[in-house]
Amino acid sequence: MSFIRGITPAAMILLEKAVETLTVVGDIRKYCEKERGKDTYWLTRDKLGQSELGKEILEALDIEFKWSNGFKDCIYSTAQLAPIIKAFCTDDKIKSCVEIIRNAEDKLRNPIAHTIVAVDNGMIKNRIGITAEELYNDVIKKVAESVRLMKKSTWNSYDEMNKLLIEKVREVK
């Protein structure tokens, strides 16, 4: 179940690409300040306020983070990318997938990331309502294909290779 631990980096790549390709926002980094000497980008109210689209993004983020008195400057993450997709993507299926991915991060990955705990499909389904296979096959693959990170044929070759590896491991046992 190391897949669950790796969901945040995968989600970042998927959501960045979704913002870039499936919304009018484009590259989120144009609304960021790059931290000197580091490869980190701070999404800032100042940068967002410099264009009409940026102001619309800021409004969506303020609504999302109203519980903490609105959006605050931060190194952007899936927590900021998801509401941008929600506000600017027209594909409801993608928005639903993004919500599931964020839910998996919040209710599954984040609580177990720094503890020693046995994770199985029962625990996963209990916390997020779907199994790891469903999360991977029905959600992550769909977003990756939609943002053209991977073609369906590529997934099929990975699936075929995984089946072959599983068969070989079983033969050795």
Segments predicted by a language model, with ranges:
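Conserved non-transmembrane functional hotspots
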Residues: 159, 163-171
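Amphipathic alpha-helical interface elements
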Residues: 1-81, 163-164
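Long, charged low-complexity terminal regions
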Residues: 70-86, 105-113, 170-173
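Residue-level marker of intrinsically disordered, low-complexity segments enriched
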Residues: 61, 82, 151, 167-170
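Generic secondary-structure transition motif, activating predominantly at the C-termini of alpha-helices
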Residues: 52, 61, 65, 89, ...
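Charge-enriched, short contiguous segments at helix-coil
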Residues: 84-160
